[in-house]
């Protein structure tokens, strides 16, 4: 009821340490981004940041005691390297030049469905001169644009590390079953690509363990 919401708002504003624990699920619905934006403004409105124990906590995933460069190995990239923001994929496929993007590898993502400026993304994916490889478990919106569709393993079929959004625990997960059919994990895909491209760095000769 409106009265209850007003009373709850007053109790929140008057609390000794107004604190909000904000999860990730809220952002994954219609108008989710604006809902999250409004909620994150509440501590500032009531002065919660000036009170010990007050404020807001969202994801802790950026605080893991884990160095991602051990996996991404950016030191192996040639310099300089052009970087393309995946949130501007539509712009990259349609307007970026010098040189133009002519090949696209998609894994662990479905940009045709979730990337901003969807119309531009779909126009880019529809280009006749764009060679698109999709590594996927399902026939997603993006997979329908693939020139080559490679089967990917599920979480039950490969080793992985999981970092939590809400705590400081890193969990190692072992496969429950072997890969089904001809499916590969992300690691196996890029390890084999490196071998076919003549990249002999020992990093790519490691197993997933």
Model-assigned labels for residue ranges:
Residues 1-51, 59-209:
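Non-catalytic alpha/beta scaffold blocks inside enzyme catalytic domains
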């Amino acid at each position: 009821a409106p009265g209850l919401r007003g009373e709850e708002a007053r109790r929140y504003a008057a609390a000794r340490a107004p604190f909000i624990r904000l999860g990730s699920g809220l952002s994954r619905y219609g108008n989710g981004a604006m809902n999250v934006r409004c909620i994150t403004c509440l501590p500032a409105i009531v002065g919660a940041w000036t009170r010990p124990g007050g404020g807001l906590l969202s994801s802790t995933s950026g605080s893991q005691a884990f160095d991602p460069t051990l996996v991404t190995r950016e030191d192996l990239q040639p310099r300089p390297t052009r970087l393309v923001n995946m949130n501007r994929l539509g712009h990259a496929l349609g307007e970026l030049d010098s040189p133009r993007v002519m090949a696209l590898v998609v894994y662990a993502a479905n940009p045709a469905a979730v990337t901003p400026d969807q119309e531009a993304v779909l126009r880019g994916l529809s280009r006749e001169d764009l060679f698109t490889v999709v590594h996927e478990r399902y026939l997603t919106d993006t997979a329908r644009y693939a020139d080559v569709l490679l089967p990917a393993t599920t979480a039950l079929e490969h080793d992985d590390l999981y970092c939590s959004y809400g705590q400081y625990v890193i969990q190692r997960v072992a496969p429950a079953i072997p890969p089904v059919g001809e499916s590969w994990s992300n690691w196996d895909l890029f390890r084999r690509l490196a071998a076919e491209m003549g990249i002999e760095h020992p990093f790519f000769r490691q197993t997933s363990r």
